[in-house]
Regions:
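Flexible, acidic loop-helix segments that line cofactor/substrate-binding pockets
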Residues: 93-109
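Conserved beta-strand-loop-beta-strand element in the redox core of flavoprotein oxidoreductases
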Residues: 1-14, 20
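FAD-site-proximal beta/loop scaffold in flavoenzymes
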Residues: 15-88
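Flavin (primarily FAD) cofactor-binding/catalytic cores of flavoenzymes
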Residues: 8, 56, 118
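Fold-independent oxyanion-binding glycine-rich loops
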Residues: 5-6, 23-25, 38, 52-53, ...
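Internal hydrophobic alpha-helix adjacent to the cofactor/substrate pocket in enzyme cavities
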Residues: 75-98, 125-126, 180, 184
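Flexible, glycine-rich terminal cap/loop adjacent to redox cofactors
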Residues: 89, 105-184
């Protein structure tokens, strides 16, 4: 497959690739739920807006999962369900989506957690990155997994890790370590 690219740093000639990952995404069905009959507001894209305790604009109605927004991941929805149940039971819990791991189960795996560079820019965070090629890791070489890399995104002022990505065999299994670094 040959791909032509655009942009300041784009190569002038089409580039050859052996494989392409196509991802089309998902669409919420908030408009199909007739949530408006209960007074629940649905935005133009079909999402139901909630607060940090998963309450909708109708205080006794909660919403969780794909219908409340990105990322549309099952483990996020399960955690939101736990938070909503705890709030309904009278506890003062809330949902903090800062560390939600995402993994594309491709070969090699592509995994990320925390803020991306784009999100850091949008939030006005001054950041730096550090990248480690797996070809420099004896363990990766010995495991025949040297085709990969780990990238960390950290706050330039505090030096705290705010995000990271891993591309490589079983990269998703290492993602928890970056998530832990973000939360510490």
């Amino acid at each position: 497959i040959y791909v032509s690219m655009e942009g300041k740093k784009a190569p002038s000639e089409p580039q050859r690739y052996d494989a392409v990952l196509g991802a089309i995404g998902r669409v919420p069905n908030g408009k199909n739920l007739d949530a408006g009959k209960a007074g629940v507001e649905v935005d133009d894209r079909g999402f139901i807006r909630v607060d940090k305790q998963l309450r909708t604009n109708v205080p006794h109605i909660f919403a969780i999962g794909d219908i409340v927004g990105q990322p549309m991941l099952a483990h996020k929805g399960v955690h939101e369900g736990h938070v909503a149940a705890e709030v309904i039971a009278g506890m003062k819990h809330y949902f903090d989506p800062k560390v939600i791991p995402s993994i594309a189960y491709t070969e090699p795996e592509v995994a990320w957690v925390g803020l991306t560079e784009k999100e850091a820019k949008e939030k006005g965070i001054s950041y730096e990155t550090a990248t480690f090629p797996w070809a420099a890791s004896g363990r990766a070489i010995a495991s025949d997994c040297a085709d990969g890399m780990t990238k960390l995104i950290f706050d330039k002022e505090t030096h705290r890790v705010i995000g990271g990505a891993i591309v490589g065999t079983n990269g998703g299994e290492l993602l928890g370590e970056i998530g832990l670094a973000i939360e510490m």
